[in-house]
Amino acid sequence: MLMLSKTAGAIPRPPRSNVRGFIRRFNVQPRALFHHKLVLGIETSCDDTAAAVVDETGNVLGEALHSQTEVHLKTGGIVPPVAQQLHRENIQRIVEEALSASGVSPSDLSAIATTIKPGLALSLGVGLSFSVQLVNQFKKPFIPIHHMEAHALTIRLTHKVGFPFLVLLISGGHCLLALVQSVSDFLLLGKSLDIAPGDMLDKVARRLSLIKHPECSTMSGGKAIEHLAKEGNRFHFTINPPMQNAKNCDFSFTGLQHVTDKLITHKEKEEGIEKGQILSSAADIAAAVQHATACHLAKRTHRAILFCQQKNLLSPANAVLVVSGGVASNLYIRRALEIVANATQCTLLCPPPRLCTDNGIMIAWNGIERLRAGLGILHDVEDIRYEPKCPLGIDISREVAEAAIKVPRLKMTL
């Protein structure tokens, strides 16, 4: 599990020669007349270097992304200094590609939006330092972006979704349920008490040595689990969902990881193989842990919907559940959430898979949303700092727990 600093960070000094070269290349007069507001979004919160230009109507004019997945697969996880160096090596190129694809010069931009919280400190610093130099050079407003708010609002780029709506954000670094009441108003109903589901699935995949599996060698851990689980029998092993007696909307995945690890150790002894070799029962284990994860996410989400309905926080006639984040691309988990949505008369919406994972489009779009609402637009960036740890919205999880809502049993026929 990656440990993040709890304090806001000063901006590291970037390689100025590269930025100057970038500025010289784009320090030209606007090449076209744009009638809409334009925002450049920059994302470096973890291990993806991404940028995009989006206009106020939601058109994506240009985008670019550099993924570090293959590098970190070899090390068994994200190494922050390595991620930082790769961001430094690629950020100029990625921003240039996004601008070039869009036909937009920095002079055409209405603002520059960049993720400054939460995330890996070393990674956040790279994006922020590069952005600050662009802001200062081209005299553009700066819009600091909360990474999880951007994930939550991405759905409004692809669908006509009004406020309020419920969002489940599930990824390798986050797991939370929140009610989105406006562009900047969030009520946190529950969150992971330990690790995120994507992190847990990655750890299980590493413990199963799926990188050595011929079908999974280039996949992330979560993708490998989903792929292998299709060949497995989830009934072969009993892995129970966590926190079944806790009547809140919080999550926990550490216990699920430990139970699975013990099961793998037991099967290794039973099959007479050493740690690091692939079990004959790997697919069955993958199927069982995926099912337990899906059931855990579904039950907490079910309770969140019931709470919002009881408190009249969601419109009964037009209730929407949005699921986003990297784990939202897991179709098995999505089917479990569809069962919950159908049982509660909610509409389940998910952004396209490429917008569920980290990307520059969601950052630019969040910038557009804030620009239109006149929220968080800075003209002085001298004191701006990144924040590796930053909660989402107002935490009302205690109120949810005190309601002690009993969730009716649903048949998870997946």
From Swiss-Prot:
Free-text comment on the cofactor: Binds 1 divalent metal cation per subunit.
Known EC number: 2.3.1.234
GO cellular component, one term: mitochondrion
Enzymatic class: transferase
MF terms in GO: metal ion binding; N(6)-L-threonylcarbamoyladenine synthase activity
Assembly with partners or alone: Monomer.
Protein name as it appears in the record: tRNA N6-adenosine threonylcarbamoyltransferase, mitochondrial
Organism: Rattus norvegicus
